[in-house]
């Protein structure tokens, strides 16, 4: 058997295999013999048809069987011989039909892990966002809580203003695009929340009860149907009801409705603490992304498309699950699955590269996970609940895969900590995050 390996890229190989004619002949005869035992041809009992007739009528079946058998018998031994480990199923690139007396030739494309030789990974320069307390953000959160507790009171006289909630019947059309026509009855619309198409909100303001009005809007540039971007659309709206939001008074009684607060001052204090915790966690996550990006920049590598594809699938499933929990879908975001994969391919590739480089760093620096590390992680998950801690330990003791995943996570965390301990971290305001670091 002859085997030729061609390097297509650092992570892709073409393997060409030629199986000698003698072996092909043997497999063909073996295949026909097996087919003959099961063959049913007119005028003959099962398994009693002459071999020559079997060869005539079952040639395609023989070719399928022998090609598959020779492929399976030769490809993986050839890969083992050349120490090639595919990261995904090999893909047939070229294959010839099997013929008596002729060598069987085929080629397959495989993807392999990149060879990683870490270069510069100490002294990486990264920026870290400086945490800044923001009283306005806390007050904004309190206002949103008031909005959620607002009562709607009917408005009998007057016209539509910002902040009002309307009940309308409507129809919508884009001239020249009949498939876009739609309509609805008793639709609830809030004016002033920034969610309406450009022009619609302005057209609703000033309408009176019972009024019917044509409102021209401009279709947004990011419309899922690209043909409609920038085109005019017309809403015909009949205003059936106007309601005005009545916000609750901002006092201790309001704060107590949320259960966690005793007074309005207590609410502000605890919301400030919660926001600080959330912001510090966000900054930590952003810093992790930045240090990995810096590592990739200093250690560029190519990664297999199949690994990136799996990462995009993983990200897509996570997004779909999150949206499902919010009663939303990809379509409601103007995306489909293929569009998502295309849009986030670069992000997925970056995640794969970062993961491989971090794994290489773990090996190079002999980063290990001790039992104390696992105990600390168990305690973190249990959050002070002793009964929960006991159950967590029992679970991870019994579930090897879950325990291995936790070990991998801890190794990654320790590798990131190592990178940051050995990095030049510059703390800056949020507005300066994407400006070049001095010396770059």
Swiss-Prot record:
Check the record and name the Pfam families matching this protein. Answer: FKBP_C, Trigger_C, Trigger_N
Superkingdom per UniProt: Bacteria
Gene Ontology biological-process entries = 'de novo' cotranslational protein folding; cell division; chaperone-mediated protein folding; protein transport; protein unfolding
Domain named PPIase FKBP-type is located at 163-248
Has the keyword Cell cycle been applied to this entry? yes
Which EC numbers characterise this protein's activity in its record? Answer: 5.2.1.8
Q: Recorded GO terms, molecular function?
A: peptidyl-prolyl cis-trans isomerase activity; protein folding chaperone; ribosome binding
Q: Does the keyword Zinc apply?
A: no
First-level EC class: isomerase
Coiled-coil ranges from the UniProt annotation: none
Reactions accelerated catalytically? [protein]-peptidylproline (omega=180) = [protein]-peptidylproline (omega=0)
> InterPro entries this protein is in?
PPIase_dom_sf, PPIase_FKBP_dom, Trig_fac, Trigger_fac_C, Trigger_fac_C_sf, Trigger_fac_ribosome-bd_bac, Trigger_fac_ribosome-bd_sf, Trigger_fact/SurA_dom_sf
Q: Where is it localised?
A: Cytoplasm
**Similarity-based family:** Belongs to the FKBP-type PPIase family. Tig subfamily.
Q: What is recorded about the protein's domains?
A: Consists of 3 domains; the N-terminus binds the ribosome, the middle domain has PPIase activity, while the C-terminus has intrinsic chaperone activity on its own.
Per the entry, what this protein does is: Involved in protein export. Acts as a chaperone by maintaining the newly synthesized protein in an open conformation. Functions as a peptidyl-prolyl cis-trans isomerase.
What is this protein identified as? Answer: Trigger factor
């Amino acid at each position: 058997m002859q085997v030729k390996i061609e390097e297509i890229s650092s992570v892709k190989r073409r393997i060409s295999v030629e199986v000698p004619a003698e072996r092909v002949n043997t497999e063909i005869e073996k295949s026909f013999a097996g087919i003959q035992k099961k063959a049913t041809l007119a005028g003959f009992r099962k398994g009693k048809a002459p071999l020559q007739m079997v060869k005539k009528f079952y040639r395609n079946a023989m070719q399928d069987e022998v090609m598959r058998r020779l492929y399976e018998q030769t490809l993986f031994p050839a890969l083992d011989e050349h120490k090639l480990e595919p990261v995904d199923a090999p893909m047939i690139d070229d294959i010839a039909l099997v013929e008596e007396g002729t060598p069987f030739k085929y080629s397959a494309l495989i993807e392999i892990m990149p060879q990683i030789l870490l270069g510069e990974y100490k002294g990486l320069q990264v920026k870290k966002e400086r945490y800044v307390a923001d009283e306005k953000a806390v007050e904004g959160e309190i206002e949103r809580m008031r909005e959620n507790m607002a009562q709607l009171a009917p408005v009998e006289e007057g016209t539509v203003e910002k902040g009002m909630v309307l009940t309308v019947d409507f129809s919508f059309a884009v001239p020249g695009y009949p498939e876009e026509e739609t309509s609805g009855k008793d639709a609830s619309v809030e004016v002033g929340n920034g969610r309406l198409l450009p022009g619609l909100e302005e057209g609703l303001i000033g309408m009176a009860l019972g009024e019917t009005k044509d409102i021209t809007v401009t279709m947004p540039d990011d419309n899922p149907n690209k043909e409609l971007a920038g085109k005019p659309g017309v809403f015909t709206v009949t205003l059936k009801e106007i309601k005005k939001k009545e916000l609750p008074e901002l006092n201790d009684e309001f704060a107590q409705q949320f259960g966690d607060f005793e007074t309005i001052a207590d609410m502000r204090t605890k919301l400030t603490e919660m926001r600080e915790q959330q912001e510090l966690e966000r900054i930590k996550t952003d810093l992790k992304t930045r240090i990995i990006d810096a590592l990739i920049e200093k250690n560029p590598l190519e990664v297999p498309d199949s690994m990136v594809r799996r990462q995009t699938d993983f990200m897509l499933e996570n997004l779909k699950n999150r949206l499902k929990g919010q009663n939303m879908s990809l379509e409601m975001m103007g995306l489909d699955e293929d569009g998502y994969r295309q849009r986030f391919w670069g992000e997925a590739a970056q995640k794969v590269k970062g993961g491989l480089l971090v794994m290489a760093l773990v090996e190079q620096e002999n980063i290990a996970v001790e039992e104390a590390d696992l105990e600390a992680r168990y305690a973190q998950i249990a959050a002070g609940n002793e009964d929960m801690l006991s159950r967590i330990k029992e679970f991870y003791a019994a579930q090897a895969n879950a325990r291995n995943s936790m070990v991998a996570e801890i190794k990654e965390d320790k590798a990131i900590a190592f990178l940051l301990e050995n990095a030049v971290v510059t703390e800056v305001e949020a507005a300066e995050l994407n400006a070049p670091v001095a010396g770059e």
